[in-house]
Each structure stands twice: as C-alpha cells, then as structure tokens.
C-alpha cells in the first residue's frame, strides 16, 4: 500500500531501475508518516559516509509530538540497502547524468519502505514527447470506447 508517490520524478526524469530500501526513522516520524504528513517532491538520494541518504524529504511533526524531542522535519534519513545493491548503484550514480530519486514510500509487513530509482534527467523536448504520447494514448482509448459503444 503506497503512502505517497513522487510524481514529479516521473515527469522530470527517465527512471531506469528501481529498488526497495528500508529507512532509519524516529518514532515521531513513523507516526507522522502514518498520518500522511510526508512530502517527497524535493527529495533525492545522496552518497555520504559509505551509505545512501534520503535528503529533502519533509515529514511534518504531529502536534501531539513529545516536548523533549526536537523534531527536524528535513533531516537526512539513512537508507538501508544490502552491500551488493549499494555497490551496483554507486557505479551507476558516478556516471555523468545519473542520480537517485525517492519514487514512493509504502508499507511492507508494517515497516515503512522507500522505493528508490536510478534516474536520468529529461530535456524539455523529452518532456514534450512524453506528454504527446500520453495525449495520444488517451485519444486512442476515447476513440476505442466510443466505437465499442456505437457497435
């Protein structure tokens, strides 16, 4: 079950490969995510200190959060991946033009997981081509539906 999706990532990037990774979260963050108070729009994944980190993911703390904990809504969150997955993605990220994006957050067996994708940026003409293709697919579906109804 998906909690939130990063639709902007699919609009601005070609997603070439996907991977599910765990997240290191604090208790108030899990409660806020379950309440749907999370935003992935400006988030990306960065390589630091031998691990991948989710940067820019905004988790708004609940009003009922504990007073002795100082919540930081945009703190970097460590991604939990196997060493083989890390090695495979490091080689691809170090190539020119590739980046890693958080595509969505979802539950797997009660745990919050992030779907991370290896992405390459789209140019303006690529975005236009994608929009034309979507529009054409919609038009085809509309015509097929009308023809089925008329027959």
UniProtKB/Swiss-Prot annotation:
GO terms for biological process: trans-translation. It is found in: Cytoplasm. One of its GO terms (cellular component) is cytosol. InterPro entries: SmpB, SsrA-bd_prot, SsrA-bd_prot_CS. The keyword Ribonucleoprotein does not apply. Keywords: Cytoplasm, RNA-binding. The keyword Transport does not apply. Pfam families: SmpB. Residues 121-151 are annotated as: Disordered. Residues 126-142 have a biased composition (Basic and acidic residues). One of its GO terms (molecular function) is RNA binding. NCBIfam families: PRK05422.1, smpB. Belongs to the SmpB family. Required for rescue of stalled ribosomes mediated by trans-translation. Binds to transfer-messenger RNA (tmRNA), required for stable association of tmRNA with ribosomes. tmRNA and SmpB together mimic tRNA shape, replacing the anticodon stem-loop with SmpB. tmRNA is encoded by the ssrA gene; the 2 termini fold to resemble tRNA(Ala) and it encodes a 'tag peptide', a short internal open reading frame. During trans-translation Ala-aminoacylated tmRNA acts like a tRNA, entering the A-site of stalled ribosomes, displacing the stalled mRNA. This is SsrA-binding protein. It comes from Chromobacterium violaceum (strain ATCC 12472 / DSM 30191 / JCM 1249 / CCUG 213 / NBRC 12614 / NCIMB 9131 / NCTC 9757 / MK).
């Amino acid at each position: 079950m998906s909690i939130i999706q990063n639709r902007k990532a699919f609009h601005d990037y070609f997603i070439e490969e996907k991977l599910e990774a765990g997240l290191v979260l604090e208790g108030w963050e899990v409660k806020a995510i379950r309440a749907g108070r999370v935003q992935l729009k400006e988030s990306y994944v960065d390589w630091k200190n031998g691990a991948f980190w989710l940067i820019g993911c905004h988790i708004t703390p609940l009003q009922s959060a504990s007073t002795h904990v100082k919540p930081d809504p945009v703190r970097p969150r460590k991604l939990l991946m196997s060493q083989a997955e890390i090695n495979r993605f490091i080689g691809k990220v170090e190539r020119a033009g590739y980046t890693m994006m958080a595509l969505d957050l979802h539950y797997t067996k009660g745990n919050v997981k992030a779907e991370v994708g290896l992405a390459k940026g789209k140019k303006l003409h690529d975005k236009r081509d994608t929009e034309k293709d979507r529009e054409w697919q919609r038009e085809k579906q509309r015509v097929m539906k009308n023809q089925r109804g008329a027959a």
